């Protein structure tokens, strides 16, 4: 959730938010810094075109990982240029391909949000803005808590991929998926 940002870690520690329940109580509350933090960070960065970038990031955070899936959900608009900027200019998303796919292939490419905080913010806060506007923080907390096992599993998976990459000694580290499913991480010596 913190994305490694010391300010966020300090806020959790200072407010005794050290368990999942306490963290969610702190994050999903009326005066929480986190409610508008993602928006404040990115609107300045994206400028007047922030809407399309927010829409793309929101879809990625919610499981639409391919360009085709995202374009379909967004009504068929072409987003190739926006994906390229999110990846290469803003460094917010990463392109992944199945571990055994041929290098350079675009088939089965998926996009993920590389920053844990922004991924969390888009998945739970921005996606559920209506709960916030109605000040229905209890239901928002329950929604996020119900998804904790799945969400934390994906974060842990990415952590292990990063750690294995830092160790070195592997030809590739990644996931394998076909059109709709993904399986466990594979690593090759």
List the predicted regions and their residue ranges:
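Amphipathic alpha-helical "lid/sensor" segments that cap RecA-like P-loop NTPase cores
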Residues: 1-43
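Short, cationic-aromatic polyanion-contact patches
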Residues: 24-27, 42, 46, 95-125
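Short amphipathic alpha-helical interaction segments
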Residues: 73-94
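Hydrophobic residues on short alpha-helical segments
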Residues: 53-61, 161
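A cross-kingdom feature that marks ATP-driven nucleic-acid transaction machinery
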Residues: 107-189
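N-terminal positioning helix adjacent to the helix-turn-helix/winged-helix DNA-binding module
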Residues: 38, 45-52
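P-loop NTPase catalytic cores that bind/hydrolyze ATP
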Residues: 3-7, 64, 86-91, 114
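Short acidic, hydrophobic short linear motifs in intrinsically disordered regions
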Residues: 63-73
């Amino acid at each position: 959730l913190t994305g490694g940002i010391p300010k966020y870690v300090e806020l959790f520690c200072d407010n005794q938010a050290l368990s999942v329940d306490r963290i969610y109580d702190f994050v999903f509350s009326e005066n929480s810094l986190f409610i508008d933090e993602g928006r404040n960070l990115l609107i300045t960065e994206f400028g007047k075109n922030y809407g399309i970038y927010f829409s793309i990031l929101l879809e990625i955070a919610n499981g639409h990982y391919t360009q085709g899936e995202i374009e379909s959900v967004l009504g068929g608009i072409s987003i190739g240029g926006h994906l390229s900027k999110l990846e290469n200019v803003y460094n917010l998303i990463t392109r992944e391909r199945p571990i055994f796919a041929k290098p350079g292939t675009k088939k089965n490419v998926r996009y993920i949000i590389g920053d844990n905080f922004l991924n969390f913010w888009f998945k739970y806060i921005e996606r559920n803005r209506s709960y916030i506007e109605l000040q229905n923080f209890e239901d928002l907390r329950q929604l996020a808590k119900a998804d904790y096992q799945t969400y934390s599993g994906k974060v842990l998976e990415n952590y292990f991929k990063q750690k294995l990459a830092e160790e070195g000694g592997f030809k590739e580290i990644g996931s394998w998926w076909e059109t709709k499913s993904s399986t466990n991480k594979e690593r090759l010596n």
